[in-house]
Amino acid sequence: MPLQVIEPTLEDYSGHCHALVVSLVRATAGSPVDLWSGEGSGAMAFGPDVTIHPLFRRRLRPLQMLRLLHRLLRRSGRIVVTTARTRDLALLALAAPGRIPPDRVFLYFHWVRETPGKLRFFRAIARRQPDIVILGTTESVVDVFRRCGFQHVALLPYPAPETMPSTEAQPFRRLLYAGAARQDKGFGIVVDLVELLAARNEQVPITVQVTPDHYGKYDAATRADIARLEAVRYPPLALIRQTPTPAEYAANFPGSICLQPYDRAEFRDRVSGVTLDALAHGCPVITTAGTWNAAMIEPFGAGIALAGPDAESLRAAAATLRADYARFRDGAFAAARARGRESWAALLARLRR
């Protein structure tokens, strides 16, 4: 029976969803997979073992998810929701014909915003469906579910991409902002940096991705920042206006310094696929201290974590990394290798039972 993998937001090759599914398919090593994904994913390819079901539309997603779970829970086979949300627990409780047995349904939570109301909800679901397997990216995520009474909770660090040893010799080429243009990812600070570089007549190459989020939208602040960026006269600036293919996206990292001045409150315990992609390609990272990103780079000397990133501190940190790029690049590869050894182990152990 194929493994039933559900990733409703997977629409194309952008974002973390694609890399996550690729990593899981690689880890399951030839086992058949039914992939239930967004309606725009039909033309994607994950290899001969994966059957794509392009099902989900954004506005209908909760209802479609409920119907899908209702159907799958009445068949044999295991179900993995690779990017789980609180709502998925409620839908499972509604869809299940009875108590879900152990090792049947796996929900992978990347982060949890802990509130009193959410904790009460988790406790209620744990009493009703204690055998749902909860996987979490960090200790603090899994601790929430353990405290709420779920009996099968495991740490599964966010899977790392394969490292790219052929890029180890790349010298510094440019600064890079990769991923969707978003305020919580410090896009405005990166625009401030470009303005500063232009004002000081510097010639440091910088590439900035200005594509929207999964839903093709920008908020007002980001639109204003893009307008500012387009108005800057800085010849070494290159803009990525279209969502890159996987190959194009990967090619951005070797020789780059990845700028991630992410919001500390939002990313204190929230995984960044861009960080993992950067490290896999030997790309050092500049990020915000006290974030998940910082915890990935600091033990390995894979970049610099800033207490309060702004344009001036980004510029100074970039100069430090450029001056000793080979050492920081090696640290990035070391961080990626350490992360890769942990990928999917907690899930695979249960699937083999």
Question: What kind of region is each of these model predictions?
Answer:
Residues M1-S14, Y177-A178, P261:
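Nucleotide-activated donor-dependent transferases that construct or modify glycoconjugates
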Residues V5-V22, Q183-K185:
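A short, glycine/small-residue-rich beta-strand->loop->alpha-helix junction that serves as a flexible
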Residues G15-H16, G308-A316, R322-R352:
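A charged, aromatic-enriched C-terminal amphipathic alpha-helix characteristic of glycosyltransferases
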Residues W111-V112, S140-V141, L155-P165, P212-H214:
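Short beta-strand->alpha-helix junction loop in the catalytic core
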Residues Q129, A220-A250, I257:
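Nucleotide-activated donor-binding/catalytic signature segment of Leloir-type glycosyltransferases, i.e.
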Residues Q260-L276, T288-G290, A294-A295:
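Nucleotide-sugar-dependent
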